[in-house]
Swiss-Prot record:
Biased composition (Pro residues): 93-103
Domain comment as written in the entry: HTH myb-type domain confers double-stranded telomeric DNA-binding while the H15 domain is involved in non-specific DNA-protein interaction and multimerization.
Chief site of localization: nucleus
Role according to the record: Binds preferentially double-stranded telomeric repeats.
Protein name according to UniProt: Telomere repeat-binding factor 5
PANTHER family for this protein: SINGLE MYB HISTONE 4, TELOMERE REPEAT-BINDING FACTOR 4-RELATED
Entry's family note: Belongs to the histone H1/H5 family. SMH subfamily.
GO biological process terms on file: nucleosome assembly
Domain H15 stretches: 119-193
Length: 287
């Protein structure tokens, strides 16, 4: 929380004005959180900033004149209503002019009047100059034309929009030829050929040849992928068969060990019986 009793220093006032220029009036919390102004305004709250901005917005002497007019209206009871109205008149508060924040992008409509759009035909000369210099048989896009004109001529900031509109208008008037290609969604413009022949347009035969080559390449790639998949599958089958053989051998070995264990168990039973009989003094004959 801020401390309203502390007198504002020049450094704090400069930080407040700089914060208003950056964030705009009323964005007190944003100004306090901004690392650029946090150190200077560490002892101030958003209410302190609001009150200080209101005091800075009121011209000097306005508040004193308003305060003096109020008691005059109460004491002079015999004056006419017209006189009271004149005494109670307050001077309107001037609206402070705040420059736009540095980070805010100024719209072209705020800088350039509509006269640029109305006077767009005067840019036809530089457009034809750019197309003649670029001399691209397939046409030039808006970006290429703009980057050619911008460093050579003085143009408004919204010239790119004016240029795009003017190119479409000239193409509609048949003063320029608009070229559309299947490789790009952008429109290309060029000066019409006086002989009437079009340059740079691929022939249907060439287009079909390129498509056929692309299809052949795709087929070859697909065949290679199929062969690789078949080889991989065969390797997996061989690996599975090897695992099956190993499992069979393990099962046979387990069966042998089971039989040996059963025979040993039977021999142990016979030996136990013989030991018991011998312990009782009986005679046993072994065949």
């Amino acid at each position: 929380m801020g401390n309203q009793k502390l007198k504002w220093t020049a450094e704090e006032e400069e930080a407040l004005l700089a914060g208003i220029r950056k964030h705009g009036p009323g964005k007190w919390k944003n100004i306090l959180r901004d690392p650029e102004f946090a150190d200077q305004l560490i002892h101030r709250s958003n209410i302190d900033l609001k009150d200080k901005w209101r005091n800075l917005s009121v011209p000097p002497g306005t508040q004193s004149l308003t305060n003096k007019a109020r008691p005059a209206k109460v004491k002079e009871e015999g004056d006419t209503p017209a006189a009271d109205a004149n005494d109670a008149v307050t001077i309107p508060r001037p609206i402070p002019t705040i420059p736009p924040p540095p980070g805010r992008r100024t719209l072209p409509s705020e800088l350039i009047p509509d006269e640029n759009t109305k006077n767009a035909p005067r840019y036809d000369g530089v457009i034809f100059e750019a197309l003649s210099a670029l001399a691209d048989g397939n046409g030039s896009d808006v970006s290429s034309i703009y980057h050619f004109i911008e460093p050579r001529h003085e143009v408004p900031p919204n010239f790119r929009r004016i240029l795009s509109t003017r190119l479409r208008r000239l193409a509609a008037q048949s003063k320029l030829e608009k070229v559309s290609t299947f490789k790009s969604i952008q429109n290309f413009y060029k000066i019409p050929d006086p002989s009437g022949t079009k340059i740079g347009v691929p022939k249907p035969k060439e287009t079909h040849t390129k498509l056929r080559q692309a299809n052949n390449q795709t087929s070859a790639d697909s065949q290679q992928m199929i062969e690789e998949a078949a080889i991989t599958a065969a390797c997996k089958v061989v690996e599975a068969e090897n695992k099956i053989d190993v499992a069979k051998l393990a099962a046979e070995e387990f069966e042998k060990m089971t039989k040996i264990a059963e025979e040993n168990r039977k021999l142990l039973v016979i030996a136990t019986e013989m030991h018991e009989l011998c312990s009782c003094g009986e005679t046993m004959l072994l065949a």
